[in-house]
Amino acid sequence: MKYILLGLLLMVVLANANRLADPNCGVCTLRSICFMEKESCPKGFKCCAFKRQDKPGSKITRGCCVKNKN
């Protein structure tokens, strides 16, 4: 039961991440959640920050890994 609830929560988080992803970073593939203060994306990817529309002055700490545009 615990894993079902965690799966549902992850789906909600990923759906919101896609909606709030920064358009300047390209398409958010949502393969992994990254943290802005750590290098948590694989090589060839960068951490693209979520836009926080609910709290305009809030500090952005999370994002999603997107492929570098080269």
UniProtKB/Swiss-Prot annotation:
- Where is the protein found, in the record's own terms? Secreted
Keyword field = Disulfide bond, Secreted, Signal, Toxin
Main localization (coarse): secreted
Residue ranges crossing the lipid bilayer per the database entry:
none
One Gene Ontology cellular component term attached to this UniProt record is: extracellular region
Tissue range of expression? Expressed by the venom gland.
How is the protein altered post-translationally, as described in the entry? Contains 4 disulfide bonds.
Q: What is the annotated signal peptide range for this record? A: 1-17
Q: Which GO terms describe its molecular function?
A: toxin activity
**Which domain of life, per UniProt?**
Eukaryota
* Family designation: Belongs to the scutigerotoxin-02 family.
Would you tell me the protein name for this molecule? U-scutigerotoxin(02)-Tl1a
